[in-house]
A protein has these predicted regions:
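Intrinsically disordered, low-complexity, charge-rich terminal extensions
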Residues: 1-322
Length: 322
């Protein structure tokens, strides 16, 4: 259901019932792309067996799904068609087209080609954990997760949703778990990524290794900091948490057995929603106990790995064992 998760804290009221939430999302339902529209987004029923409902509430968790349809117009195809049109212009006018003319011709070609393009859809699942008042969006991409929040805001009319930040930075928790001083619920797994604190910002990635080994632990003492750390949440899940609080590679350890023991598509979907919701609820609770509840002015987190070394590629070392 969710492989990557971005959390958002909510500061406004949430619909009190499944039906109320469904009715509001239905007003922002998905509509296919028009011939001249590059992207169209809206909510769709998350459960195929219940096409009349745009939300499903199970065990204190609301399940929603945003669908986006995108017209695929490759830049290469547009440029090739534009070049042919420019050649026609040169032959007809006996002059080189100016910047304004090129822009106008490009817009004309785009309008001609767009209705003929193929479309593709992407679906993003979101869960609202009622007891924690946290929205979990199943997207690793910040832009994709923010799109879900913006469409929820439009559907609900008023939604104060901000990225999940606690009193102390997530990097502190990564270090504590890595050194064996973290919460007992979080068990060190076999994957991590570290970044140099020096200007070069080189990175080292360890995978499928014992992170408690002295060689790996020494990296933290050699002027490096953790940006990603694999962990196991008790016996329920394993995942990777980064220094911004984003969860990736989420894997529910009991999901296969649960699916085998459940009959019916709706029952399986409800069981999965309850399992994922309960796992995320437990993780949020652990994070809050370890780092303190949301603060009005949370400490600034380290820059994301993607923002480092602008204009150049930092050195990277990946260490993987079988």
């Amino acid at each position: 259901m969710l492989r990557s998760v971005r959390f958002y804290s909510l500061g406004t009221d949430w619909p009190s019932s499944e039906q109320e939430l469904s009715d509001r999302l239905a007003k922002a339902a998905f509509k296919p792309c028009g011939p001249y529209v590059e992207r169209s987004s809206g909510f769709e029923p998350p459960i195929a067996a219940q096409p009349e409902l745009f939300a499903r509430r199970v065990a204190g968790t609301d399940l929603m799904r945003l669908r986006s349809q995108i017209r695929v117009l490759p830049a290469g195809a547009l440029n090739e068609a534009l070049e042919a049109r420019l050649e026609e212009y040169r032959a007809r006018m006996q002059e080189e087209p100016g910047r304004r003319t090129k822009r106008q011709l490009k817009e004309q070609m785009r309008d001609e080609l767009l209705p003929k393009t193929l479309v593709r859809s992407e679906r993003t699942t979101a869960l609202f954990i009622l007891s924690e008042r946290v929205l979990a969006v199943g997207a690793g991409s910040e832009a994709r997760a923010d799109r879900v929040v913006e469409h929820l805001r439009a559907a609900l009319g008023n939604l104060d949703a901000t990225p999940f930040e606690l009193a102390r930075p997530f990097g502190e928790l990564l270090t504590r778990v890595f050194t064996g001083d973290g919460p007992r619920e979080l068990v060190l797994a076999r994957e991590c990524r570290l970044r140099e604190l020096r200007d070069e910002h080189g990175t080292v990635r360890w995978q499928n290794v014992d992170l408690a080994h002295a060689t790996v632990q020494r990296c933290l003492k050699d002027d490096m900091e953790l940006t990603h750390l694999g962990f196991e949440l008790g016996s329920t899940a394993r995942a990777v948490l980064d220094a911004r609080g984003v969860v990736t590679k989420l894997e529910l350890l009991g999901q296969d057995a649960l699916a085998e023991g459940t009959e019916g598509a709706l029952a399986r979907q409800d069981a999965e929603t309850a399992l994922v919701g309960g796992t995320l609820r437990e993780l949020i609770s652990v994070l809050r106990r370890a780092l303190g509840n949301e603060a009005a002015a949370a400490p600034r987190r380290p820059a994301s790995p993607e923002s480092l070394g602008a204009g150049s590629t930092p050195p990277h070392l990946s260490l993987v064992t079988a």
